[in-house]
Amino acid sequence: MSIDNKNVVYQQLLRLGYGVRVGQLQAGEVDFVCMKRKKQVYVQVCYLIATEETEEREFGVLRRIADNHPKYVIFLSPLVKRDNIEGIIHLGMREFLLKGF
């Protein structure tokens, strides 16, 4: 995963009005923990989820967060469309940049 790709997501989150920080949680590290008014959102960014190992790395930390705030995995590969997993929303980069959450 290129740092530049995470920067694109970071800049878009700021543009959408979120306060953004890296999440060091008991569950592990989340790419971004975002706050806007009283809304909190967790975001992981990845290129492609092609293996179970990658899926566990990207979704696992979000699964271990024991609250009801929205959780997103933003992926960069334009060829992949996946269903939501355990309430975690799988969102393409293009869709995120055009529509946000």
Locations of the language-model features?
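A cross-kingdom feature that marks ATP-driven nucleic-acid transaction machinery
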Residues: 1-101
